[in-house]
Amino acid sequence: MIRSLGKIVPETSALFICDIQSKFANHIFKFNGVVNQSKYMMRVCNELKVPIIFTEQYPKGLGHTFEDLLKERNENNQTKIFEKTLYSMCTNEVLNHLKQNHKDLKSILITGIETHVCVLQSTLDFLENGYDVHILSDAVSSNNNNDRLIALERMRQSGAFITTTESIIFQLTRDATHKSFKSIVPITKQRRDDLVADPSLSLSKM
């Protein structure tokens, strides 16, 4: 069996944003960086009509998705929020939604928290269900960076693709003649400017 090369196109991709909830804000390593990268990834996905799926871990106790991300939702793009108690995003409800509404889905792009718990378990479950999984390493985090780094390597060992937000953005557009290229360039420029203005937002170290 030939291992997937991990190529992605908008038509068969979806962005999964894992449990970026208000109660975690003061407990996650570089939480604001995770929010910032996820925000720009959402803007690109909205432009390319890549569906976005949020999960919320026990929102009754942990709060709902961080407001800055909810503001990025676009009525012209598909967005869905699933509540869960399972650590994995790959719940029966989510799988049924994918089978009914995204039958051509191949590539799952993941941002969120915590890398070594919900992101890791989601990745293993989605891989087991036959999806390619791409972890945006600069858009996932944990309570501490060591757990984050070990989890990234653990997911790589299991067959996930460890990548970055910017790399995914340019994979999705692929060609400078893409019809959305001129709309996406300012998004990537603003993202870079944010990282220069506030280096604390960067989670680039792996």
Curated annotation (Swiss-Prot):
InterPro entries: Isochorismatase-like_dom, Isochorismatase-like_sf, Isochorismatase_domain. Signal peptide: none annotated. Pfam families: Isochorismatase (PF00857). Coiled coil: none annotated. Gene3D superfamilies: Isochorismatase-like (3.40.50.850). Belongs to the isochorismatase family. This is Isochorismatase family protein 1B.
